[in-house]
């Protein structure tokens, strides 16, 4: 169940970040409200996750996968560019998250 909470937290963080981009500095009402609601849900489920999983693994997974998926969305939806160094760096983040989850401290 705790990995479901983490997944919901990551998904709503990505949604919130996408709304943040479209809010244009909090000048657009609906994207601003979407940002606030999404991040509220995100941090609620993140707080539930850290009740069950170690903070270091939870945060690394949340931040790492959030960054990777947000980058993918920024390329697909917002037509932003990434270079080779960015792609390699994102690959290293994915490797780090996997290693932490496989070999990191667990309860």
Curated annotation (Swiss-Prot):
Where would you say this protein principally sits, based on its record?
A: membrane
Instruction: Fetch the SUPFAM superfamilies from UniProt.
Output: Multidrug resistance efflux transporter EmrE (SSF103481)
Tell me the Gene Ontology biological-process terms attached to this UniProt entry: glycine betaine transport
Keywords from the UniProt entry: Cell membrane, Membrane, Plasmid, Transmembrane, Transmembrane helix, Transport
**What GO terms are given for molecular function?**
amino-acid betaine transmembrane transporter activity; antiporter activity; choline transmembrane transporter activity
Query: Per the record, GO CC terms?
Result: plasma membrane
Q: Where in the cell is it found?
A: Cell membrane
Give the residue spans that cross the bilayer. 1-21, 26-46, 57-77, 84-104
Membrane topology type:
Multi-pass membrane protein
Q: Does the keyword Transcription apply?
A: no
Q: Which domain of life is it from?
A: Bacteria
What this chain does, per the record?
Answer: Multidrug exporter. Is implicated for the resistance to bacteriocidal quaternary ammonium compounds.
PANTHER family reported in the protein's UniProt record = MULTIDRUG TRANSPORTER EMRE (PTHR30561:SF1), SMR FAMILY PROTON-DEPENDENT DRUG EFFLUX TRANSPORTER SUGE (PTHR30561)
User: Family per UniProt?
Assistant: Belongs to the drug/metabolite transporter (DMT) superfamily. Small multidrug resistance (SMR) (TC 2.A.7.1) family.
Recorded protein name is: Quaternary ammonium compound-resistance protein QacG
Q: Which organism is it from?
A: Staphylococcus sp. (strain ST94)
Gene name, per UniProt, is qacG
